[in-house]
């Protein structure tokens, strides 16, 4: 069953009689932004999460260099899946990636990415595409130097397919995801209540267990940035890493930290 957001229509104002400003563009989606503007634009107001100043991209950049990916993102062909509002795209572009192709399935998020590209002066090396990232990976026969998937894995109903396709279409990856942590769920009944069952699954020869997460009332928010269904399947940390190994990744750098929704894994890997 697919989620049908109540905000399916384009409901922002069609004409502005005021002086043109960058804030006007951000205000097309007033109340829907997750990201705050870059720190060098304190004059602008949007969301509250500092994704345009996110240290995770610098972390990935340096860990990639540590494992022998010369210059990290710099000079690399990068595929980004689920850019949300373009914050990580902006940071990778500022590291002078040779090209960034960012695929976003959420139509409102895609439009916010275009606003961010214009407002925050991303380069012509950045291209945003509207569509399903899994369909893109299945059909576009291209191998990228680095693939980035931040905040995506735990919004899918077949997360291992994403890991398989990342291995097929990239030589190195940066992955950030929340994962199913039974200790966290036991100690935090509110987010824990959103999990309803666990199921055995198999994809491309990899057997694993997934835990159903139900979005619930979150689906009613115009700025909802989850998946396209009313639920998703979460994996445990050890099985995420095991799946990547199964599909050919051999060198890993990982870091775990707490998150409001559960334990989070930050990972770079290369073949």
Predicted features along the sequence, with ranges:
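Conserved SAM-binding strand-loop segment of SAM-dependent methyltransferases
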Residues: 122-133
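Glycine-rich SAM-binding Motif I of class I
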Residues: 82-90
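Conserved alpha-helix/loop element of class I SAM-dependent methyltransferases that forms part
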Residues: 53-74
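N-terminal, positively charged/glycine-rich alpha-helical extensions of SAM-dependent methyltransferases
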Residues: 2-45
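Class I SAM-dependent methyltransferase SAM/SAH-binding core
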Residues: 91, 95-123
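Class I SAM-dependent methyltransferase Rossmann-like catalytic core
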Residues: 43-57
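S-adenosyl-L-methionine-dependent methyltransferase catalytic module, highlighting the catalytic core
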Residues: 134, 138, 149, 157-270
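Short SAM/SAH-binding signature in class I
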Residues: 143-151
